[in-house]
Amino acid sequence: MDLPAVPSSVLEALQGSARSLGIPRLALVGGVVRDQLLHQRWGRDWSGVPDLDWVVEGDTAALVAELSRQVGSERISGVQTHGSFGTVALQLDGIPLDLASARQEHYPAPAENPVVRMGTLQADLSRRDFTINAMALDLVTGELIDLHHGQQDLASGQLRLLHAGSVADDPTRVIRAARYAARLGFQLAEESHLQIRSTIQQWPWAWTHGDAALSAPPALASRLRMELERLFEREPWPQALDLLEQWRALPLLDGQLQNDPERKLRLRWARRLGLPLMPALLLGAADPVATAQRLQIPGKQQQWLQQCVALHNWLADTPPCLEASPSIWSTALEQQGWQPEAVALAVTLRPKPWKPLLRWWGRWRKIQAPQTARDLLAAGWQPGPGMGEELRRQRSAAQERSR
């Protein structure tokens, strides 16, 4: 299998270093193998080489040292070592490489972080999420290793979980399934679809909705959020969210999100207003603030959600009348101390008086008094409450003129 845009000098240097040390396996793994097969055999567009992920049956630190000895340190840059298994990131001739020792893992409890130990390439491939991501190109032998029939699923456009306990072990795989299916245009294999639905219905995890938010295991908390962030940042997210809804998988986030008819409108408004999509999505949850805490979204976004919920309740109780002037609406909103993003999030909910909120977000809040405190002092005003009142009066008048 050829690797376009990867210089042969890079491959030869890695191959030579592995052979010098007697390393039995040095294999390219992950999305680059999948995408290159799709390109070569099925004519998919080649989007260029991402970071290259390699699995080593042996000592990665020793391999990097031998590589440096053979090619010279001037060709290698940015060497960083991470973790107890000697994962090494570097650049060889400007090409990013990530090398990791082969490993195997088991889950001490569903949705907890796995326990990892050294293993073989075969074990490393068997711990992955989908058959199409569990292939490897062995640089030492030139062999394409496909233990789980990933090529067959590529040919048929199927996305298949690797084993029967995949979702129970790591529910973030469901979000990844939606990401890949939306990006590649693949169909979820029937048994994988059944596994997702039945696992979520059975709910094998120790934590459940209503429990303390911060007691959720990582794959139902921060790691679930990270997959959602990747979905919003990298993928055709409207299609991916539709798939999660079709698979009845949104209860992983919150049961109410599974039946959320306003989701698409909320997210369209959030994008239009330049807001992060995550808090707009979570506004459809039964308890948006608790869900945000569990997923550990950024603190400022949690604050926006808290304020948005408070604003929504305020609108239901004692808002200004719909026909109130710009200055009255501005004063009422600003006295509450709500951040602008919280008001914009409230717009995505389309409450009955949503237009004044939108106008405040887009225009009224940005209007300033035509004069500054320095101007008033120069005109003979004395410092004190009266000067502040005059500046507020001027700003209100300017807001009224903006109707």
Identify the role of each PLM range:
Residues 1-403:
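Catalytic cores of the polymerase beta-like nucleotidyltransferase superfamily
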